[in-house]
Amino acid sequence: MTTQFSVAGIELELFRYPASQESNLQAWDAADEHLINTLVEGGQTAVPTAIINDSFGALSCALSRLTPDWPLNVETDARTSFLGAEQNHHRNQLSMENLTWFTSRDALPSDLALVLMKLPKNLTYFAHQLMRLSQVLPAGSKVLVGAKAKSINTSLLEVFAKYLGPASASLAWKKTRVITCISDGKPRALPKEITWDIPEFNLHISNLSNVFAANKLDIGARIMLDNLPQGDFKTIVDLGCGNGVLGLRAAQLYPNADIHFIDDSEMAVASAKANWANNQLPAETGHFHWDDCMTHLPDGVEPDLVLCNPPFHQGEAITDHIAWQMFLDARRRLKNGGILHIVGNRHLAYHVKLQRLFKNCTTVASNGKFVILQAQK
C-alpha cells in the first residue's frame, strides 16, 4: 500500500481510516488525482468550494496544501470519511480552520462557486446530492465529478441533466474521467423518503437515500429476523444498523431492553431513529449513534447482545476490515457471557474470524448463500 500522494506538485502522506488497519488499499484513487490535475491545469483560484464524497480527505488535504485558506465546505454521510480527513489533515500538519463540515441532510451554503465530487456507488444517493446542489447553485456554476471511466455512460449524463444541468465527460486518464456539469439554476425538490411495510412483523419502514436495501428487506436481514436468539437481554446493539430493522424487531422481542443503533452512515442512523418513532417504540429505550463501529459508544454501555449484518464494501472498495473491526469491538464491549449474533455470505468465512477472536462459534441457521453465526464472550 502506498501512502505518498504526489499530484501537480502537491505532496501528502495519506492513510485510510483508521491508519492502523491492515490493508493493501490506499486512501485515494486516480479519480482524485484527475480532479486535482484538472483544477491546477485550469488555473482554478480559491473560491468557496464544496467537496462531496471525499473518502479520506485526499481532495480537502490537497486543496488545503495548495492554498491554506481555500474556503472548503465538505459534505459526507460517512463518519469514517470525516475521521479520515481529520486524521490526514493532522498528519500533514494542515489547519482545518478553512473547513466547514456538512452531512448530506444539512443545508448547504448559498455562496458556493465550485463543486468537486466523487461519484458514489449508490446512484439514488447521487441523484439526491445533485438535487441538493440545484437548490443553492446559481446558473453557470461548475460541478466537477471524478469517476471510473467504465461508470460513465449516456444514462449517467442524463441524470445530471435531469437533476442539475447539462454535463460532458473528459478524455480518459488512468481509466478515469472528469465530468463537467454546468448548473442550469433551476431548483429541484428533494425526493420523499422511501416507505414500505413488513406486515409479518407489523413494522413500517422508511429509508433515506443512502441507506442499503432501500425499498425491501435484503436477504441477509430476512434470515436474521427469522433467527434472532432467545433470552432476557437488557442492552442490545444493532451494529451497522442501516434502517434499524434488526433493532426494531429486537425491541418487539425484548421489550425490557435498551437498544443502541450504530452506523457509519448519518442517513442510516437518522432513518433508524425515524423508524423507532414511527413504530411507536418508547423514546427512553432507543439510542442512536453516528459512529465508526463502537469506537465512541459511552463507557457505561455494556451490551449482552450485539446484532450485526456486516458490510463488505467501503465505497467502491471490497474489504473485510469493517467486519473485523465490528467483531473486535463486539468482543471488547460485550459483557462476559454476552452474545455476538451475525449474518454473512457463506464465502466470507466469518466463522474463522469468530473462532479466532472468541474461541467459539456456532452455526445457528443457513441457506444456500447466507449463514447465521453466534459467538459468546
UniProtKB/Swiss-Prot annotation:
Xref: SUPFAM superfamilies: S-adenosyl-L-methionine-dependent methyltransferases
Gene3D superfamilies: Vaccinia Virus protein VP39
Alphabetical keyword list: Cytoplasm, Methyltransferase, rRNA processing, S-adenosyl-L-methionine, Transferase
InterPro entries registered for this protein in UniProt: DNA_methylase_N6_adenine_CS (IPR002052), rRNA_m2G-MeTrfase_RlmG (IPR017237), RsmC/RlmG (IPR046977), SAM-dependent_MTases_sf (IPR029063), Small_mtfrase_dom (IPR007848)
Gene Ontology MF term list: 23S rRNA (guanine(1835)-N(2))-methyltransferase activity; nucleic acid binding
Source species: Shewanella sp. (strain MR-7)
Protein's job: Specifically methylates the guanine in position 1835 (m2G1835) of 23S rRNA.
Reactions that this protein is recorded to catalyse: guanosine(1835) in 23S rRNA + S-adenosyl-L-methionine = N(2)-methylguanosine(1835) in 23S rRNA + S-adenosyl-L-homocysteine + H(+)
Protein name: Ribosomal RNA large subunit methyltransferase G
